[in-house]
Design a protein with these regions (language model features):
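Beta-strand/loop-dominated core regions that host nucleotide or nucleotide-derived cofactor-binding catalytic loops
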Residues: 2-49, 54-107, 111-114, 118-165
């Protein structure tokens, strides 16, 4: 990810909030309620995502068809579901931005869908390591013998993680 430059930043309107919450509810279900706040700002950036700020922290990210918590959002406001658990041997690669390969996957929650973000967590502590875009549904990932299972979108230490406002 290249350096993120904020072009514009403003509070979102009620209609935008409704659209955002609908997309978020599709992604993480009823846990979307964890991400409501009196004021949510949108930061239009040079990155491939729109970033939503709650209390001046980048908590949510949105692309055309989906919205999902950033790693900071997942840590500050933990939610259940949409998880791919990776073994501890994969952790050093994940935090350097590597995609998830099938041999490193321990388990997958059944709600993981191809093309919609999921959270990659370590098997020991369940700590979020990355936001990934699965290439297959949960059953497809588990059926894979080898190969790439998910693309890394946002990881600990990348530009979005280090974004300070």
């Amino acid at each position: 990810m290249a350096e993120i430059i904020i072009k514009k930043r403003h509070a979102i309107k009620k209609g935008q909030l409704t659209s955002l919450m609908t997309k978020l509810k599709e992604s993480i279900g009823d846990d979307a309620e964890l991400y409501t706040a009196p004021m949510i700002e949108i930061a239009e950036t040079t990155s491939r995502f729109n970033i939503y700020l709650i209390n001046k922290k980048p908590i949510l990210m949105e692309k055309d068809e989906w919205a999902f918590p950033t790693l900071r959002g997942a840590i500050l406001r933990p939610f259940s579901g949409r998880r791919i658990v990776v073994d501890m041997g994969a952790v050093p690669y994940m935090v350097n931005g590597a995609d998830i390969m099938r041999p490193g996957i321990v388990s997958v929650t059944p709600d993981v869908k191809a093309g919609y973000p999921a959270l990659a967590v370590d098997e020991s502590h369940g700590k979020p390591l990355a936001v990934v875009l699965p290439l297959y549904d949960a059953d497809g990932i588990l059926a894979l013998g080898k190969g790439k299972a998910a693309k890394n979108l946002h990881y600990v230490g990348d530009e979005l993680w280090n974004l300070e406002l």
